[in-house]
């Protein structure tokens, strides 16, 4: 939701995905405020746009998903160039991995994510080059990745180690 502005402002994507998954305006507002994604007024405008399908273009871009995740984690809410939020998220993940090498078993994390979120297989670097999204059920899974953003947001609110690294 948000047209061209959403490609530069990942917070719009995060708000849209959270609201789309929660289907409850009050609950979404609470989470958006706790995550400090945007002002209450901006969140209300985004939700009204979603309800009325104004500037509501569905995207199958993994980059937009990463922009939303970057905003939810507090890494980058807006970008000055294409891919900035996604790159910041990648750098933060690499820094986290270096800092917590013994604490994170990435293979187990990816295996679990593949079970819960079909899109995770596309995100995994080892498979991203060979994974094609061309079947209706695959496209549906991509469009339903708001569940992934919601899960990440809930983990951050629950106090999971999602410290700002970028």
Locations of regions flagged by a protein language model:
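Phosphate/diphosphate-binding loops
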Residues: 1-21
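A contiguous, well-structured pocket-lining segment that forms one wall/lid of small-molecule binding clefts
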Residues: 16-166
């Amino acid at each position: 939701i948000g047209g061209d502005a959403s490609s530069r402002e990942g917070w719009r994507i995060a708000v849209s995905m959270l609201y789309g998954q929660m289907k409850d305006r009050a609950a979404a507002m609470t989470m958006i405020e706790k995550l400090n994604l945007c002002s209450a007024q901006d969140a209300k405008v985004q939700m009204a746009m979603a309800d009325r399908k104004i500037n509501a273009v569905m995207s199958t871009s993994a980059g937009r998903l990463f922009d939303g995740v970057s905003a939810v984690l507090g890494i980058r809410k807006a970008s000055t160039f294409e891919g900035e939020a996604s790159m910041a998220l990648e750098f933060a993940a690499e820094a986290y991995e270096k800092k917590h090498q013994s604490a994170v078993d990435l293979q187990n994390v990816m295996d679990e994510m593949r079970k819960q979120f079909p899109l995770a297989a596309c995100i995994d670097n080892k498979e991203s080059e060979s994974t094609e999204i061309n079947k209706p059920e695959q496209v549906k899974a991509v469009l339903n990745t708001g569940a992934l953003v919601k899960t990440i947001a809930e983990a951050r609110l629950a106090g999971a180690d999602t410290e700002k690294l970028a």
